[in-house]
Design a protein with these regions (language model features):
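Hydrophobic, well-ordered secondary-structure elements that form the walls
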Residues: 254, 295, 315, 323, ...
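Terminal RNA-binding accessory module
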Residues: 330, 338-436
Length: 436
């Protein structure tokens, strides 16, 4: 049985696809790269944003035509199955549906002669998804979250928090390092909620990272994924000690979403801006060169001009290293979708205005690195084919004179230029320090 898989969305989805590939190969299937060669077509969907949903629905219409010509079986997997099963079933009634909670049953669905609708159920944590692309490994440490944000459809799709057993994560890291990964991305919807479902005596994120560092030898670097302020704060000091470890990137991703307490309350976020600010200040006081990334949504229902300008001021004040900016889009079955909406032209104006501030702040922060010498680990190629390295704090450095065969090595670089998004540099004397 030949299976083609098409994937949309986040790191968790890419990891789920890798798990599906492994399971399919174990049950006698061949994963192919050409959709026209496939007996079975799997589309792993994402539902976090309206534009992504629309792109997937448009693609599914085209795949329906391919299925008619090739007589292939169609399976739709991923977050749209959990959050919008009726939309999918109406568009493609002949497709089997497999939610993220049922991904471990993919072989059963592929080999079934019937259309299967596996939507409900609990996610199995007996096997952990592992996605390796080049020298970068993405390892989920948990599924779901403890939040109930008014705008978020991912909560509906990924559901309640389920942490993967500590030893399973450690084993996955060991396997990734064995296969040549030099960057280990520990990912989840909220990494600092790890272990909160495992009981009072269960491991938390700092415990997990210490166990990895102790039990997995080799030259690799750990990047910690997104951590919500309310779950980060209780483990903050412990996590700071872990961040000081040589093999952990000095990097945190803490979503702010809005600096207006009025909007945060409407969003059902579990912190105030003042609490968020204290976390950022504490991190910088202990690790001065730490990189702090954040997420901001503009145009959420209830956000007025004053709220927006509070957020604008906060970005200028806190000097974030990286900001992922999103215009709010209503998602089905969410509380915010039923609220009075901010007009689209207003959302667009706020997005454009804040984007300019983000660029100015990013450029100011990154210019501090110009003419500095830095050790970098060469992790991947950019979409243009340039070699990209990472500083100790995960700042990206595009190396203009490095060749693709050097990915996976460490080197010293001279930083010559800066943009708001990355640094540009060259190898010092072309010397590679160490193969990792």
């Amino acid at each position: 049985m030949k299976v083609y898989i098409e994937t949309y969305g986040c790191a968790l989805n890419r990891a789920d696809t890798s798990l599906m590939k492994a399971l399919l190969q174990e049950c006698g299937c061949e994963v192919v790269s050409n959709i026209y060669d496939a007996d079975v077509i799997v589309v792993n969907t994402c539902t976090v944003r309206l534009d992504t949903e629309q792109r997937i629905l448009k693609r599914l219409k085209k795949i329906k035509e391919i299925v008619k010509r090739t007589n292939a079986k169609l399976i739709i997997a991923g977050c749209m199955v959990s959050a919008q099963p009726y939309t999918l079933h109406k568009l493609v009634p002949e497709a089997s549906l497999v939610s993220p909670q049922n991904i471990h049953r993919i072989c059963e669905v592929v080999w079934s002669k019937n259309n299967e609708l596996l939507i409900r159920g609990e996610r199995s944590t007996s096997r952990l998804p592992l996605h390796i692309e080049g020298k970068v490994a993405v390892i989920p440490i948990a599924e779901g979250c403890l939040g109930n944000c008014a705008y978020c459809i991912t909560k509906i799709a990924r559901r309640r928090l389920r942490s993967y057993p500590l030893q399973l994560v450690v084993n996955a890291v060991r396997e990734a390092v064995r296969r040549g990964a030099v960057e280990i991305d520990l990912t989840a919807q909220d990494t600092t909620s790890y272990g909160l479902d495992l009981g009072a005596e269960g491991p938390r994120l700092p415990d997990l990272i210490r166990e990895i560092l102790e039990k997995v030898p080799g030259n690799y670097f750990i990047r910690i994924g997104m951590a919500n302020p309310d779950t980060l704060e209780p483990v903050l000091d412990d996590l700071i000690e872990v961040l000081k470890e040589p093999k952990v990137f000095k990097y945190v991703h803490i979503p702010l979403q809005s600096a207006s307490n009025h909007v945060l309350k409407i969003m059902r976020r579990k912190y105030t801006f003042e609490e968020f600010k204290r976390i950022v200040q504490h991190l910088r006081s202990k690790i001065p060169e730490i990189t702090i990334a954040t997420d901001i949504i503009v145009g959420h229902p209830g956000e007025d001009d004053e709220d927006f300008h509070i957020t604008l001021k906060a970005v200028k004040e806190l000097l974030f290293d990286k900001v992922h900016l999103a215009q709010y889009t209503p998602r089905p079955r969410t509380e915010a979708a039923a609220m009075p909406q901010v007009p689209d032209p207003v959302k667009k104006y706020r997005s454009t205005t804040l984007a300019k501030v983000i660029e100015d702040v990013g450029l100011t922060v990154n210019r501090q690195y110009i003419n500095s010498h830095a050790k970098v680990v060469l992790t991947h190629l950019s979409f243009r084919g340039s070699v990209v390295g990472r500083l100790f704090n995960y700042k990206p450095v595009v190396l203009t004179d490095a060749t693709p065969d050097l990915v996976g090595f460490q080197a010293y670089a001279l930083i010559r230029e800066a943009t708001f998004y990355d640094l540009r540099g060259s190898l010092i004397n072309g010397v590679v320090i160490k193969n990792i």
